[in-house]
UniProtKB/Swiss-Prot annotation:
This protein's UniProt keywords: Cell inner membrane, Cell membrane, Ion transport, Membrane, NAD, Sodium, Sodium transport, Translocase, Transmembrane, Transmembrane helix, Transport, Ubiquinone
Lineage: Bacteria, Pseudomonadati, Pseudomonadota, Gammaproteobacteria, Alteromonadales
EC numbers on record: 7.2.1.1
Native source organism of the sequence: Shewanella sediminis (strain HAW-EB3)
Gene encoding the protein: nqrD
Identification of the protein by name: Na(+)-translocating NADH-quinone reductase subunit D
Membrane topology: Multi-pass membrane protein
Main location: membrane
Coiled coil: none
Location of the protein in the cell: Cell inner membrane
Length: 210
């Protein structure tokens, strides 16, 4: 049974020390696509965290009964089943957001973070630790998404969660929104900036040269 210290390390590690986007550079495609609004970034974070946590839990519970030759198929079946559940819940209770997220919820099935944690961690670790690892990686993924979404929506549209924060010139205010921040390439540069900041603070994350 894992003690509280181990659980805390597993939960907090992926947020900064081993962030799936900033350090491992996984899940970047969805991070570019769903961060033009803070609302979609938050919902995507919740969706991926739920899938990652519960897929880790179920795969860990089944790990001693899965033949090595079909383990990837079993993992994808578990993940796909959870993604379908999450997608149906979103369409039932948050239809407008589900439409904005489009295919990206479905693509959680092939998300490198979810697949990677299932194969590298859940297949070798007890259920509770695996569950907490899934939550930690989901929060780490979400921390980057929400940071990028905050900057893009605030300075690209002058709002947060659809509520106007910076009064726009077109409405008689003072702020001219930067439309470039609403384009996907801007997310790429913002993520790069976050990675640079994190690696400046934690230089041990910088890859060795040569």
């Amino acid at each position: 049974m894992a003690n509280a210290k181990e659980l805390k390390e597993v939960l907090s590690g992926p947020i900064v020390s081993n962030n799936p986007i900033a350090l491992q550079v996984l899940g970047v495609c969805s991070a570019l696509a769903v961060t033009s609004k803070l609302e979609t970034a938050l919902v995507m974070t919740i969706a991926l965290t739920a899938v990652c946590a519960f897929s880790n839990l179920f795969i860990s519970m089944l790990r001693n009964h899965i033949p090595s030759s079909v383990r990837i198929i079993v993992q994808m079946t578990v993940i796909a089943s959870l993604v379908i559940v999450v997608d149906q819940v979103l369409q039932a209770y948050a239809y407008d957001v589900a439409k904005q997220l489009s295919v990206f919820v479905g693509l959680i099935i092939t998300n490198c973070i979810v697949m990677g944690r299932a194969e590298a961690y859940a297949m070798k670790t007890p259920p509770m630790m695996s569950f907490m690892d899934g939550i930690g990686n989901g929060i780490g993924y979400g921390a980057i998404l929400l940071s990028v979404g905050f900057v893009r929506e605030l300075f690209g549209n002058g709002s947060l969660f659809g509520v106007e924060i910076l009064s726009k010139i077109s409405d008689g205010g003072w702020y001219q929104p930067n439309g470039l921040l609403l384009l996907p390439p801007s997310a790429f540069f913002l993520i790069g900036t976050l990675i640079w900041i994190i690696r400046t603070i934690k230089p041990e994350q910088v890859e060795a040269k040569g």
